[in-house]
Amino acid sequence: MDEQVIFTTNTSGTIASVHSFEQINLRQCSTQSRNSCVQVGNKYLFIAQAQKALINVYNLSGSFKRESVEQRLPLPEILKCLEVVENNGVQYDRIQGVNHNLPDFNLPYLLLGSTESGKLYIWELNSGILLNVKPMAHYQSITKIKPILNGKYIITSGNDSRVIIWQTVDLVSASNDDPKPLCILHDHTLPVTDFQVSSSQGKFLSCTDTKLFTVSQDATIRCYDLSLIGSKKKQKANENDVSIGKTPVLLATFTTPYSIKSIVLDPADRACYIGTAEGCFSLNLFYKLKGNAIVNLLQSAGVNTVQKGRVFSLVQRNSLTGGENEDLDALYAMGQLVCENVLNSNVSCLEISMDGTLLLIGDTEGKVSIAEIYSKQIIRTIQTLTTSQDSVGEVTNLLTNPYRLERGNLLLEGESKGKQASNNNGHNFMKIPNLQRVIFDGKNKGHLHDIWYQIGEPEAETDPNLALPLNDFNAYLEQVKTQESIFSHIGKVSSNVKVIDNKIDATSSLDSNAAKDEEITELKTNIEALTHAYKELRDMHEKLYEEHQQMLDKQ
């Protein structure tokens, strides 16, 4: 198992390995906006091209991997951000009572893209249908799109200093021509550059401890508790106010001396790392005070308690007058937190490794530095292999994901063991459907459309006679009833009872037991004799060794 890093600059794209020196360049790759690159599973890479209404598709898996463009998808207009929504995290499908593995050609459910004017496009990838277009999702350009909770909600941020949370079902519903957001966060005063969501997620926002971290050019980090968002309430005809449920609670605000460009969270939500023009800094969310005291900076006050988020000011450790011996308790009482400087560079993008030990830092010079978080040392620097220009521009996209080492392939995921879909020329004939330009009319029930979907290989261990609730619910209930009756008749005590039919069997069993006792006594006698003989041999050996040692001393 290894990790690969994918990063793009203004004029190039590169795929490299974190722990080895394997590296390739992507051809005809040009991006100028952040978050314009998205990985579709372990197979495809979508990159929205700069100054072109086009998405370049690169194949990254198996024997079909190519450095050149695999497919081009025309767009209605130039897109700035891309994101995909997976199929609710389903690992396999159950079809006709048989479990099927993930197929080789496995596409996500939705593809989302945004424009410079704040317009939001939603496509269904398996058919290419344009489900909906939100003309004014943001007043200005959208900077990032991210789905959470297996695609139930979608979060967007923009240059209009707003962060908006949408319900996916509202965006794709045919009956909802103008979808409304679930809630809007407008605490920032300048464009929101990046945001991250904590790893503690569940099926619903109300029963999770999901936290949202947003950063902006106003030099602030804001943390919200998303678990208090309720369902939307319909507006009544005679009421002027519209209630959309409880808004997220602002837990804390962190101010910095510099404008923030990027943020990344530790996989265990222990710390956050921010990138600025003056360097990369780390902040422990479980802040250690003097001695053994530890403070949770994001402690929530509860559902029924009105809490006003605290405001903290971040201070570099090397800028303190007292150095390492500075009184952390006094600084914390004044609302100041000491943060560590990881790297001094003009940071544009940040990512973290799967185990949280390595930090990947993309700068404005087109380089990606891999730094060890504990020692704050640069382990490796990755650059574009070949270029004829003096500068390739800043790093616009930075992605990391784990991959398998298979058949000596040290860079991209090896060819799967199942059947490969290929033609005589050795190219993959499974193509992604073209993205439509006209919104699909879902109200027309007689209008049919095609969906491109491949079914994976069936699992060998699956019992074909197994009844599933989606296929035959009555048979499934009968099967559960049978299993329950079997368990109800089984007692808690398991014992073996020997039944003696007559006296002859009893006498023979007694004779066999007596013979076994005699054999055991004889074996014990033999063991005692062998032990006594071994002791005599050991004494003789010790005496001979002493005599031999005395003879050597005389010589």
From Swiss-Prot:
Any single GO CC term annotated in Swiss-Prot or TrEMBL for this entry: rixosome complex
InterPro entries attached to this UniProt entry: WD40/YVTN_repeat-like_dom_sf, WD40_repeat_dom_sf, WD40_rpt, WDR18/Ipi3/RID3
PROSITE patterns assigned to the protein according to its UniProt record, in alphabetical order: WD_REPEATS_2 (PS50082), WD_REPEATS_REGION (PS50294)
WD repeat start-end pairs: 90-133, 137-176, 187-234, 342-383
Residues the record lists as Phosphoserine modifications: S388
The keyword Lipoprotein belongs to this UniProt entry's keyword annotation: no
GO biological process assignments: DNA-templated DNA replication; rRNA processing
Cellular compartment(s): Nucleus
Keywords for the protein's UniProt record, in alphabetical order: Nucleus, Phosphoprotein, Repeat, Ribosome biogenesis, rRNA processing, WD repeat
Role this protein plays: Component of the RIX1 complex required for processing of ITS2 sequences from 35S pre-rRNA.
Subunit organization: Component of the RIX1 complex, composed of IPI1, RIX1/IPI2 and IPI3 in a 1:2:2 stoichiometry. The complex interacts (via RIX1) with MDN1 (via its hexameric AAA ATPase ring) and the pre-60S ribosome particles.
Family in the record: Belongs to the WD repeat IPI3/WDR18 family.
Record protein name field: Pre-rRNA-processing protein IPI3
Taxonomic source organism: Saccharomyces cerevisiae (strain YJM789) (Baker's yeast)
